[in-house]
């Protein structure tokens, strides 16, 4: 097994669901990751009698999200309502248009360690993750003299972090002792 592994990915995504300004339509999405297999280092060779794998993992990535319920344009909802005993078709405008809407972004960080011992009878993985969402689309109240009650804008953010622990064991897979079967009295 190799000691070091690096990985990377880059792409450009675009959408016409965002603002009219072209600079908001595209988002570079990328990730980078690395792994150091510590168990293959010379200073750990004596431990390889009982330790099968010890590895440290790190990664970072940026991804985008499209909120398909928003639009940079003025949108209306058609509905039928009864007005003075007549059925009338009306258009209700949801929110003010925003030509500066852009991608929601999520940056993800991850650090982890993997350990396998006793011919992979015990496997342990511990991961720390941190995710930060920015430019999340939400509705902000507007002054009522605008004629609109709210507008979709990129203003929210959110953080998520935690630790994940995964322990797997392979229990005894063979029978160590079997009792003799009773003999047939014939």
Regions found by a protein language model. Give the residues of each.
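A short, hydrophobic C-terminal helix/tail in secreted or cell-surface proteins
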Residues: 180-186
């Amino acid at each position: 097994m190799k000691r070091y592994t690096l990985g990377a990915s880059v792409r450009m995504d675009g959408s016409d669901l965002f603002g009219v300004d072209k600079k908001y339509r595209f988002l570079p999405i990328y990730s980078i990751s690395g792994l150091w297999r510590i168990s293959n280092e010379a200073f750990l060779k004596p431990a390889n009698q009982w330790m099968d794998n010890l590895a440290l993992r790190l990664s970072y990535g940026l991804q985008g999200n499209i909120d398909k319920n928003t639009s940079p344009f003025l949108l209306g909802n058609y509905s039928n309502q009864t007005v003075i005993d007549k059925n009338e078709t009306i258009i209700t405008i949801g929110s003010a248009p925003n030509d500066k809407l852009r991608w929601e972004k999520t940056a993800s960080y991850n650090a982890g360690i993997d350990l396998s011992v006793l011919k992979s009878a015990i496997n342990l993985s511990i991961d720390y993750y941190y995710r930060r969402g920015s430019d999340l689309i939400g509705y902000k109240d507007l002054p009522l003299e605008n004629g609109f009650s709210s507008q979709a804008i990129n203003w929210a953010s959110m953080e998520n972090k935690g630790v994940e622990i995964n322990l797997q064991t392979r229990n005894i897979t063979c029978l160590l002792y079997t009792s003799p079967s009773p003999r047939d009295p014939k």
